[in-house]
Amino acid sequence: MVKMIVGLGNPGSKYEKTKHNIGFMAIDNIVKNLDVTFTDDKNFKAQIGSTFINHEKVYFVKPTTFMNNSGIAVKALLTYYNIDITDLIVIYDDLDMEVSKLRLRSKGSAGGHNGIKSIIAHIGTQEFNRIKVGIGRPLKGMTVINHVMGQFNTEDNIAISLTLDRVVNAVKFYLQENDFEKTMQKFNG
């Protein structure tokens, strides 16, 4: 069996620490203590790293298509490596959840998230595992774009750091147990 963990974000140092790049941050934290080296794969339009965990190949992916076209990379990789949709997890930001809130789901709509809209459009289903990290709503008078492209303030940065630790633990638990339902029960809330 092969697993694929995808973190959504935008490529380039300009976006590195933005709220919208929480998926990239999560992937970086997950692989920190694993022997994973990323390569920039132009064919798949993604940075890809892999390792074996519990005798299963696991791909860690950061699409380089920019957020709104993430589905292009996800679909190409699922197809090429013959990865089942049930073995996919997508990690991304959610502005409808308070900062640092964590929510795991096995299906659902895009909820206005363009990266998720792209994935749904390309893979043809809303039924895939996802880990959502709350980034909160924009302050009064601030646009959604400025909010998601902004960085966390110091206080929120501390909370997000702790949440990213929980994301790492959730992914490790999932890879060990091979059961997303059980992972949701343990880490939601």
From Swiss-Prot:
EC class = hydrolase
Q: A single GO CC term, please?
A: cytoplasm
* Keyword line: Cytoplasm, Hydrolase, RNA-binding, tRNA-binding
InterPro entries xref list? Pept_tRNA_hydro, Pept_tRNA_hydro_CS, Pept_tRNA_hydro_sf
Q: Which residues form the active site?
A: 20
Source organism's superkingdom?
Bacteria
Which residues does this entry assign to the site Stabilizes the basic form of H active site to accept a proton? 93
Question: Which positions, given as ranges, span the membrane?
Answer: none
Q: Which reaction does it catalyse?
A: an N-acyl-L-alpha-aminoacyl-tRNA + H2O = an N-acyl-L-amino acid + a tRNA + H(+)
Role noted for this protein: Hydrolyzes ribosome-free peptidyl-tRNAs (with 1 or more amino acids incorporated), which drop off the ribosome during protein synthesis, or as a result of ribosome stalling.
Instruction: List, alphabetically, the PANTHER family matched.
Output: PEPTIDYL-TRNA HYDROLASE
This chain belongs to the protein called Peptidyl-tRNA hydrolase
Q: Organism, per UniProt?
A: Streptococcus pyogenes serotype M49 (strain NZ131)
* Organism ancestry: Bacteria, Bacillati, Bacillota, Bacilli, Lactobacillales
Q: Which gene encodes it?
A: pth
